[in-house]
Protein backbone atom coordinates (compact mmCIF):
# COMPACT_ATOMS: atom_id res chain seq x y z
CA UNK A 1 0.00 0.00 0.00
CA UNK A 2 1.42 3.29 -1.11
CA UNK A 3 0.66 6.71 0.34
CA UNK A 4 -0.25 9.32 -2.25
CA UNK A 5 -0.10 12.27 0.09
CA UNK A 6 3.37 13.67 -0.50
CA UNK A 7 2.43 16.12 -3.25
CA UNK A 8 1.03 18.87 -1.00
CA UNK A 9 2.87 22.14 -0.46
CA UNK A 10 6.14 21.10 -2.12
CA UNK A 11 7.59 24.56 -1.64
CA UNK A 12 6.93 24.82 2.11
CA UNK A 13 9.89 24.11 4.38
CA UNK A 14 8.60 22.88 7.71
CA UNK A 15 10.74 21.15 10.36
CA UNK A 16 10.55 17.80 8.50
CA UNK A 17 9.44 19.03 5.07
CA UNK A 18 12.94 18.47 3.64
CA UNK A 19 12.14 14.75 3.64
CA UNK A 20 9.90 15.42 0.63
CA UNK A 21 12.30 15.44 -2.30
CA UNK A 22 11.77 18.04 -4.97
CA UNK A 23 11.36 16.71 -8.48
CA UNK A 24 13.08 19.53 -10.31
CA UNK A 25 16.85 19.58 -10.29
CA UNK A 26 19.16 21.97 -12.00
CA UNK A 27 21.83 20.75 -14.29
CA UNK A 28 25.41 21.00 -13.10
CA UNK A 29 26.63 22.64 -16.26
CA UNK A 30 24.63 25.23 -18.12
CA UNK A 31 24.68 24.90 -21.87
CA UNK A 32 25.95 28.11 -23.40
CA UNK A 33 24.94 28.51 -27.06
CA UNK A 34 27.63 29.68 -29.45
CA UNK A 35 27.91 33.38 -30.15
CA UNK A 36 27.14 32.78 -33.80
CA UNK A 37 23.68 31.43 -32.89
CA UNK A 38 22.56 34.07 -30.41
CA UNK A 39 19.17 35.60 -31.30
CA UNK A 40 19.27 38.76 -33.35
CA UNK A 41 16.72 40.43 -31.10
CA UNK A 42 17.46 41.36 -27.50
CA UNK A 43 13.96 42.41 -26.40
CA UNK A 44 10.49 40.95 -26.70
CA UNK A 45 8.27 42.76 -29.17
CA UNK A 46 4.87 41.06 -29.02
CA UNK A 47 2.32 41.40 -26.23
CA UNK A 48 1.84 37.63 -25.91
CA UNK A 49 5.54 36.97 -25.26
CA UNK A 50 5.71 39.79 -22.72
CA UNK A 51 2.68 38.35 -20.93
CA UNK A 52 4.27 34.89 -20.87
CA UNK A 53 7.49 36.25 -19.35
CA UNK A 54 5.60 38.37 -16.82
CA UNK A 55 3.59 35.33 -15.68
CA UNK A 56 6.79 33.28 -15.30
CA UNK A 57 8.55 36.10 -13.39
CA UNK A 58 5.57 36.41 -11.06
CA UNK A 59 5.62 32.65 -10.48
CA UNK A 60 9.34 32.72 -9.62
CA UNK A 61 8.74 35.61 -7.22
CA UNK A 62 5.92 33.71 -5.48
CA UNK A 63 8.04 30.56 -5.25
CA UNK A 64 10.86 32.55 -3.66
CA UNK A 65 8.43 33.91 -1.07
CA UNK A 66 6.81 30.54 -0.33
CA UNK A 67 10.20 28.81 0.02
CA UNK A 68 11.08 31.21 2.89
CA UNK A 69 7.89 30.66 4.95
CA UNK A 70 9.49 27.89 7.03
CA UNK A 71 12.41 30.19 7.91
CA UNK A 72 9.99 32.97 8.89
CA UNK A 73 7.95 30.51 10.98
CA UNK A 74 11.02 29.17 12.79
CA UNK A 75 12.02 32.73 13.79
CA UNK A 76 8.62 33.98 14.90
CA UNK A 77 9.90 36.92 16.98
CA UNK A 78 12.05 38.35 14.22
CA UNK A 79 9.46 37.68 11.52
CA UNK A 80 6.66 39.38 13.47
CA UNK A 81 8.62 42.63 13.62
CA UNK A 82 9.73 42.27 10.01
CA UNK A 83 6.47 41.11 8.39
CA UNK A 84 3.82 42.56 10.64
CA UNK A 85 1.29 40.87 12.94
CA UNK A 86 -1.19 39.85 10.23
CA UNK A 87 1.36 38.15 8.00
CA UNK A 88 3.14 36.57 10.98
CA UNK A 89 -0.18 35.15 12.22
CA UNK A 90 -0.98 33.75 8.78
CA UNK A 91 2.51 32.21 8.59
CA UNK A 92 2.06 30.56 12.02
CA UNK A 93 -1.32 29.15 11.01
CA UNK A 94 0.21 27.86 7.78
CA UNK A 95 3.03 26.26 9.79
CA UNK A 96 0.54 24.55 12.12
CA UNK A 97 -1.38 23.11 9.17
CA UNK A 98 1.78 21.84 7.51
CA UNK A 99 3.02 20.35 10.76
CA UNK A 100 -0.32 18.60 11.25
CA UNK A 101 -0.09 17.21 7.72
CA UNK A 102 3.44 15.97 8.31
CA UNK A 103 2.44 14.34 11.60
CA UNK A 104 -0.43 12.52 9.96
CA UNK A 105 1.73 11.44 7.05
CA UNK A 106 4.46 10.11 9.36
CA UNK A 107 1.81 8.35 11.47
CA UNK A 108 0.31 6.73 8.36
CA UNK A 109 3.74 5.68 7.16
CA UNK A 110 4.51 4.09 10.50
CA UNK A 111 1.14 2.30 10.57
CA UNK A 112 1.65 1.09 7.02
CA UNK A 113 5.09 -0.26 7.94
CA UNK A 114 3.61 -2.13 10.90
CA UNK A 115 0.82 -3.56 8.75
CA UNK A 116 3.34 -4.70 6.15
CA UNK A 117 5.29 -6.49 8.88
CA UNK A 118 2.04 -8.15 10.05
CA UNK A 119 0.83 -9.32 6.64
CA UNK A 120 0.48 -12.86 7.98
CA UNK A 121 -2.49 -11.69 10.11
CA UNK A 122 -4.57 -10.25 7.26
CA UNK A 123 -7.55 -12.42 8.19
CA UNK A 124 -7.61 -11.16 11.79
CA UNK A 125 -10.24 -8.66 12.90
CA UNK A 126 -7.78 -6.26 14.50
CA UNK A 127 -5.80 -6.11 11.24
CA UNK A 128 -8.91 -5.12 9.29
CA UNK A 129 -9.82 -2.53 11.95
CA UNK A 130 -6.41 -0.91 11.75
CA UNK A 131 -6.59 -0.95 7.95
CA UNK A 132 -10.01 0.71 8.09
CA UNK A 133 -8.65 3.33 10.51
CA UNK A 134 -5.81 4.06 8.08
CA UNK A 135 -8.29 4.51 5.24
CA UNK A 136 -10.23 6.98 7.40
CA UNK A 137 -7.01 8.87 8.14
CA UNK A 138 -6.22 8.99 4.42
CA UNK A 139 -9.69 10.28 3.62
CA UNK A 140 -9.06 13.17 6.04
CA UNK A 141 -5.85 14.20 4.26
CA UNK A 142 -7.35 15.84 1.11
CA UNK A 143 -9.34 18.47 3.08
CA UNK A 144 -6.22 19.26 5.10
CA UNK A 145 -4.19 19.52 1.91
CA UNK A 146 -6.81 21.88 0.48
CA UNK A 147 -6.58 24.02 3.63
CA UNK A 148 -2.80 24.18 3.22
CA UNK A 149 -3.22 25.29 -0.39
CA UNK A 150 -5.68 28.01 0.65
CA UNK A 151 -3.39 29.06 3.49
CA UNK A 152 -0.47 29.30 1.07
CA UNK A 153 -2.52 31.45 -1.30
CA UNK A 154 -3.59 33.67 1.61
CA UNK A 155 0.00 34.20 2.81
CA UNK A 156 1.20 34.98 -0.71
CA UNK A 157 -1.67 37.44 -1.20
CA UNK A 158 -0.78 39.21 2.06
CA UNK A 159 2.90 39.39 1.09
CA UNK A 160 2.09 40.75 -2.36
CA UNK A 161 -0.14 43.40 -0.80
CA UNK A 162 2.80 44.47 1.39
CA UNK A 163 5.83 44.89 -0.95
CA UNK A 164 8.11 46.02 1.87
CA UNK A 165 7.48 42.86 3.91
CA UNK A 166 7.87 40.74 0.77
CA UNK A 167 11.24 42.35 -0.03
CA UNK A 168 12.44 41.86 3.57
CA UNK A 169 11.40 38.21 3.50
CA UNK A 170 12.96 37.71 0.08
CA UNK A 171 16.27 39.06 1.39
CA UNK A 172 16.51 36.12 3.85
CA UNK A 173 18.06 33.83 1.22
CA UNK A 174 20.20 31.94 3.75
CA UNK A 175 17.06 30.45 5.31
CA UNK A 176 16.07 28.70 2.08
CA UNK A 177 16.72 24.95 1.84
CA UNK A 178 18.90 23.40 -0.85
CA UNK A 179 15.92 21.66 -2.45
CA UNK A 180 13.94 24.89 -2.74
CA UNK A 181 16.98 26.77 -4.06
CA UNK A 182 17.48 23.99 -6.59
CA UNK A 183 13.87 24.33 -7.72
CA UNK A 184 14.18 28.13 -8.01
CA UNK A 185 17.39 27.76 -10.02
CA UNK A 186 15.52 25.38 -12.31
CA UNK A 187 12.76 27.94 -12.78
CA UNK A 188 15.33 30.67 -13.51
CA UNK A 189 17.00 28.39 -16.03
CA UNK A 190 13.58 27.66 -17.55
CA UNK A 191 12.98 31.43 -17.79
CA UNK A 192 16.27 31.94 -19.63
CA UNK A 193 15.51 29.08 -22.00
CA UNK A 194 11.97 30.36 -22.63
CA UNK A 195 13.23 33.93 -23.11
CA UNK A 196 15.77 32.75 -25.68
CA UNK A 197 13.10 30.59 -27.33
CA UNK A 198 10.74 33.56 -27.65
CA UNK A 199 13.52 35.76 -29.06
CA UNK A 200 14.58 33.16 -31.61
CA UNK A 201 12.95 33.38 -35.02
CA UNK A 202 12.09 30.24 -37.05
CA UNK A 203 15.00 30.91 -39.41
CA UNK A 204 17.42 31.21 -36.47
CA UNK A 205 15.98 28.02 -34.98
CA UNK A 206 16.60 26.19 -38.25
CA UNK A 207 20.15 27.58 -38.41
CA UNK A 208 20.75 26.43 -34.84
CA UNK A 209 19.44 22.94 -35.60
CA UNK A 210 21.63 22.81 -38.73
CA UNK A 211 24.66 23.95 -36.70
CA UNK A 212 24.02 21.26 -34.08
CA UNK A 213 23.63 18.62 -36.81
CA UNK A 214 26.92 19.73 -38.41
CA UNK A 215 28.66 19.55 -35.04
CA UNK A 216 27.17 16.09 -34.47
CA UNK A 217 28.35 14.85 -37.86
CA UNK A 218 31.79 16.32 -37.27
CA UNK A 219 31.98 14.63 -33.86
CA UNK A 220 30.88 11.36 -35.47
CA UNK A 221 33.65 11.63 -38.07
CA UNK A 222 36.20 12.45 -35.39
CA UNK A 223 34.97 9.49 -33.36
CA UNK A 224 35.41 7.21 -36.38
CA UNK A 225 38.97 8.48 -36.82
CA UNK A 226 39.63 7.95 -33.12
CA UNK A 227 38.21 4.41 -33.32
CA UNK A 228 40.43 3.68 -36.32
CA UNK A 229 43.51 4.98 -34.52
CA UNK A 230 42.57 3.01 -31.41
CA UNK A 231 42.21 -0.14 -33.50
CA UNK A 232 45.61 0.50 -35.06
CA UNK A 233 47.07 1.09 -31.61
CA UNK A 234 45.50 -2.14 -30.34
CA UNK A 235 46.94 -4.02 -33.32
CA UNK A 236 50.39 -2.54 -32.65
CA UNK A 237 50.10 -3.47 -28.97
CA UNK A 238 49.06 -7.01 -29.90
CA UNK A 239 52.02 -7.28 -32.28
CA UNK A 240 54.36 -5.98 -29.63
CA UNK A 241 52.95 -8.42 -27.06
CA UNK A 242 53.38 -11.26 -29.54
CA UNK A 243 56.99 -10.27 -30.12
CA UNK A 244 57.56 -10.02 -26.36
CA UNK A 245 56.03 -13.47 -25.90
CA UNK A 246 58.31 -14.86 -28.61
CA UNK A 247 61.33 -13.25 -26.97
CA UNK A 248 60.26 -14.56 -23.57
CA UNK A 249 59.89 -18.03 -25.08
CA UNK A 250 63.39 -17.80 -26.57
CA UNK A 251 64.76 -16.57 -23.22
CA UNK A 252 63.07 -19.46 -21.42
CA UNK A 253 64.51 -21.93 -23.94
CA UNK A 254 67.97 -20.43 -23.42
CA UNK A 255 67.55 -20.67 -19.65
CA UNK A 256 66.54 -24.32 -19.93
CA UNK A 257 69.46 -24.99 -22.24
CA UNK A 258 71.82 -23.20 -19.85
CA UNK A 259 70.44 -25.21 -16.94
CA UNK A 260 71.02 -28.44 -18.85
CA UNK A 261 74.54 -27.30 -19.75
CA UNK A 262 75.24 -26.51 -16.09
CA UNK A 263 73.98 -29.92 -15.01
CA UNK A 264 76.02 -31.63 -17.71
CA UNK A 265 79.11 -29.62 -16.76
CA UNK A 266 78.64 -30.48 -13.07
CA UNK A 267 78.38 -34.19 -13.89
CA UNK A 268 81.34 -33.97 -16.21
CA UNK A 269 83.31 -32.07 -13.58
CA UNK A 270 82.48 -34.69 -10.97
CA UNK A 271 83.59 -37.52 -13.24
CA UNK A 272 86.71 -35.62 -14.19
CA UNK A 273 87.45 -34.98 -10.53
CA UNK A 274 87.10 -38.66 -9.66
CA UNK A 275 89.28 -39.68 -12.56
CA UNK A 276 91.79 -37.00 -11.59
CA UNK A 277 91.91 -38.26 -8.03
CA UNK A 278 92.58 -41.77 -9.27
CA UNK A 279 95.19 -40.49 -11.65
CA UNK A 280 96.65 -38.35 -8.89
CA UNK A 281 97.06 -41.33 -6.63
CA UNK A 282 98.69 -43.24 -9.45
CA UNK A 283 100.88 -40.35 -10.44
CA UNK A 284 101.82 -39.41 -6.87
CA UNK A 285 103.90 -42.49 -6.47
CA UNK A 286 105.48 -41.99 -9.86
CA UNK A 287 106.11 -38.30 -9.25
CA UNK A 288 108.21 -38.70 -6.13
CA UNK A 289 111.23 -39.39 -8.27
CA UNK A 290 110.54 -36.34 -10.38
CA UNK A 291 110.13 -33.89 -7.48
CA UNK A 292 113.67 -32.67 -7.56
CA UNK A 293 113.56 -32.19 -11.29
CA UNK A 294 110.24 -30.39 -11.06
CA UNK A 295 111.54 -28.14 -8.28
CA UNK A 296 114.44 -27.18 -10.46
CA UNK A 297 112.04 -26.51 -13.32
CA UNK A 298 109.90 -24.42 -10.97
CA UNK A 299 112.85 -22.28 -10.05
CA UNK A 300 113.64 -21.80 -13.70
CA UNK A 301 110.03 -21.00 -14.51
CA UNK A 302 109.80 -18.52 -11.62
CA UNK A 303 112.79 -16.68 -12.92
CA UNK A 304 111.25 -16.72 -16.40
CA UNK A 305 107.93 -15.51 -14.95
CA UNK A 306 109.61 -12.62 -13.19
CA UNK A 307 111.34 -11.65 -16.38
CA UNK A 308 108.06 -11.85 -18.34
CA UNK A 309 106.29 -9.71 -15.73
CA UNK A 310 108.95 -7.08 -15.98
CA UNK A 311 108.78 -7.19 -19.74
CA UNK A 312 104.97 -7.02 -19.95
CA UNK A 313 104.46 -4.26 -17.38
CA UNK A 314 104.67 -1.57 -20.06
CA UNK A 315 102.21 -3.51 -22.20
CA UNK A 316 99.82 -3.70 -19.25
CA UNK A 317 100.02 0.08 -18.74
CA UNK A 318 99.27 0.66 -22.43
CA UNK A 319 96.31 -1.73 -22.29
CA UNK A 320 94.96 0.05 -19.20
CA UNK A 321 95.15 3.40 -21.01
CA UNK A 322 93.43 1.89 -24.02
CA UNK A 323 90.70 0.47 -21.77
CA UNK A 324 90.12 3.89 -20.16
CA UNK A 325 89.97 5.49 -23.59
CA UNK A 326 87.44 2.91 -24.80
CA UNK A 327 85.27 3.44 -21.72
CA UNK A 328 85.37 7.21 -22.29
CA UNK A 329 84.35 6.75 -25.91
CA UNK A 330 81.50 4.46 -24.83
CA UNK A 331 80.21 7.12 -22.42
CA UNK A 332 80.43 9.75 -25.15
CA UNK A 333 78.51 7.49 -27.55
CA UNK A 334 75.84 6.91 -24.89
CA UNK A 335 75.44 10.67 -24.35
CA UNK A 336 75.30 11.24 -28.10
CA UNK A 337 72.69 8.48 -28.42
CA UNK A 338 70.57 10.09 -25.69
CA UNK A 339 70.76 13.50 -27.36
CA UNK A 340 69.89 12.02 -30.77
CA UNK A 341 66.97 10.11 -29.27
CA UNK A 342 65.61 13.32 -27.69
CA UNK A 343 65.95 15.08 -31.06
CA UNK A 344 64.19 12.16 -32.77
CA UNK A 345 61.41 12.34 -30.17
CA UNK A 346 60.94 16.07 -30.83
CA UNK A 347 60.97 15.40 -34.56
CA UNK A 348 58.39 12.62 -34.07
CA UNK A 349 56.10 14.98 -32.14
CA UNK A 350 56.42 17.61 -34.89
CA UNK A 351 55.64 14.98 -37.53
CA UNK A 352 52.66 13.83 -35.48
CA UNK A 353 51.30 17.39 -35.41
CA UNK A 354 51.90 17.70 -39.17
CA UNK A 355 50.17 14.34 -39.66
CA UNK A 356 47.09 15.55 -37.78
CA UNK A 357 47.01 18.75 -39.85
CA UNK A 358 47.33 16.72 -43.04
CA UNK A 359 44.48 14.49 -41.86
CA UNK A 360 42.29 17.58 -41.53
CA UNK A 361 43.41 18.78 -44.99
CA UNK A 362 42.65 15.31 -46.35
CA UNK A 363 39.09 15.53 -45.01
CA UNK A 364 38.65 18.91 -46.73
CA UNK A 365 40.12 17.56 -49.98
CA UNK A 366 37.77 14.57 -49.83
CA UNK A 367 34.82 16.95 -49.55
CA UNK A 368 36.12 18.97 -52.53
CA UNK A 369 36.73 15.74 -54.45
CA UNK A 370 33.12 14.65 -53.90
CA UNK A 371 31.91 18.02 -55.22
CA UNK A 372 34.24 17.80 -58.26
CA UNK A 373 33.15 14.21 -58.97
CA UNK A 374 29.53 15.31 -58.98
CA UNK A 375 30.34 18.25 -61.31
CA UNK A 376 32.38 15.92 -63.57
CA UNK A 377 29.47 13.47 -63.80
CA UNK A 378 27.17 16.34 -64.81
CA UNK A 379 29.67 17.58 -67.44
CA UNK A 380 30.15 14.01 -68.70
CA UNK A 381 26.38 13.60 -69.06
CA UNK A 382 26.17 16.89 -70.96
CA UNK A 383 29.04 15.79 -73.23
CA UNK A 384 27.32 12.48 -73.94
CA UNK A 385 24.11 14.34 -74.86
CA UNK A 386 26.05 16.73 -77.15
CA UNK A 387 27.97 13.82 -78.74
CA UNK A 388 24.76 11.93 -79.38
CA UNK A 389 23.16 15.03 -80.89
CA UNK A 390 26.23 15.66 -83.09
CA UNK A 391 26.18 12.06 -84.32
CA UNK A 392 22.51 12.36 -85.16
CA UNK A 393 23.20 15.62 -87.04
CA UNK A 394 26.07 13.99 -88.95
CA UNK A 395 23.91 10.99 -89.83
CA UNK A 396 21.17 13.36 -90.99
CA UNK A 397 23.72 15.28 -93.08
CA UNK A 398 24.99 12.00 -94.62
CA UNK A 399 21.45 11.02 -95.50
CA UNK A 400 20.82 14.46 -97.02
CA UNK A 401 24.08 14.27 -99.03
CA UNK A 402 23.20 10.79 -100.26
CA UNK A 403 19.70 11.97 -101.20
CA UNK A 404 21.12 15.02 -103.01
CA UNK A 405 23.66 12.82 -104.82
CA UNK A 406 20.92 10.39 -105.81
CA UNK A 407 18.68 13.23 -106.98
CA UNK A 408 21.55 14.75 -108.99
CA UNK A 409 22.36 11.36 -110.54
CA UNK A 410 18.74 10.78 -111.48
CA UNK A 411 18.52 14.29 -112.90
CA UNK A 412 21.71 13.87 -114.93
CA UNK A 413 20.45 10.51 -116.20
CA UNK A 414 17.20 12.10 -117.15
CA UNK A 415 19.05 14.92 -118.99
CA UNK A 416 21.30 12.43 -120.80
CA UNK A 417 18.36 10.32 -121.88
CA UNK A 418 16.47 13.37 -123.05
CA UNK A 419 19.53 14.57 -125.03
CA UNK A 420 19.98 11.13 -126.55
CA UNK A 421 16.35 11.06 -127.58
CA UNK A 422 16.64 14.49 -129.16
CA UNK A 423 19.81 13.44 -131.04
CA UNK A 424 18.13 10.28 -132.31
CA UNK A 425 15.24 12.36 -133.61
CA UNK A 426 17.64 14.78 -135.35
CA UNK A 427 19.53 11.88 -136.95
CA UNK A 428 16.29 10.34 -138.25
CA UNK A 429 15.31 13.63 -139.89
CA UNK A 430 18.75 14.06 -141.50
CA UNK A 431 18.71 10.60 -143.10
CA UNK A 432 15.24 11.22 -144.61
CA UNK A 433 16.37 14.46 -146.21
CA UNK A 434 19.48 12.79 -147.74
CA UNK A 435 17.41 9.99 -149.28
CA UNK A 436 15.04 12.51 -150.97
CA UNK A 437 17.96 14.41 -152.51
CA UNK A 438 19.46 11.21 -154.01
CA UNK A 439 16.26 10.26 -155.76
CA UNK A 440 15.96 13.71 -157.38
CA UNK A 441 19.46 13.47 -158.89
CA UNK A 442 18.70 10.09 -160.47
CA UNK A 443 15.66 11.38 -162.23
CA UNK A 444 17.56 14.20 -163.75
Swiss-Prot record:
Signal peptide: none annotated. It comes from the Eukaryota. InterPro entries: DRC10, IQ_motif_EF-hand-BS. GO terms for cellular component: cytoplasm; cytoskeleton; motile cilium. Residues 421-444 are annotated as: Disordered. Keywords: Cell projection, Cilium, Coiled coil, Cytoplasm, Cytoskeleton, Flagellum. It is found in: Cytoplasm, Cytoskeleton, Flagellum axoneme. Residues 400-429 form the IQ domain. Residues 212-246, 325-397 form a coiled coil. Pfam families: IQ (PF00612). Component of the nexin-dynein regulatory complex (N-DRC), a key regulator of ciliary/flagellar motility which maintains the alignment and integrity of the distal axoneme and regulates microtubule sliding in motile axonemes. Component of the nexin-dynein regulatory complex (N-DRC). Interacts with CFAP52. Belongs to the DRC10 family. This is Dynein regulatory complex protein 10. It comes from Bos taurus (Bovine). The gene is IQCD.
Amino acid sequence: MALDVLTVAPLYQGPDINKIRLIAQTTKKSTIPPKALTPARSKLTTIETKRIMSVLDETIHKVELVSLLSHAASESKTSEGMLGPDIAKAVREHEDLCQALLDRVSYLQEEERKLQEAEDFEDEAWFRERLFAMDLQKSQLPPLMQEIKESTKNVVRLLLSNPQAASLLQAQTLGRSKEAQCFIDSLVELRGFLFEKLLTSPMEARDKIQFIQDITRRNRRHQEIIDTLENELAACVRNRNAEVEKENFVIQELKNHLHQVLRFSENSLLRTKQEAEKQQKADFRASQARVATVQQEILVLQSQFYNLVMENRDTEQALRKKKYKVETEIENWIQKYDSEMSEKQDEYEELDIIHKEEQLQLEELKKRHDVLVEEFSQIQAEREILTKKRLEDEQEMVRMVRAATLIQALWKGYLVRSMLKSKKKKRGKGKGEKKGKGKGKGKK
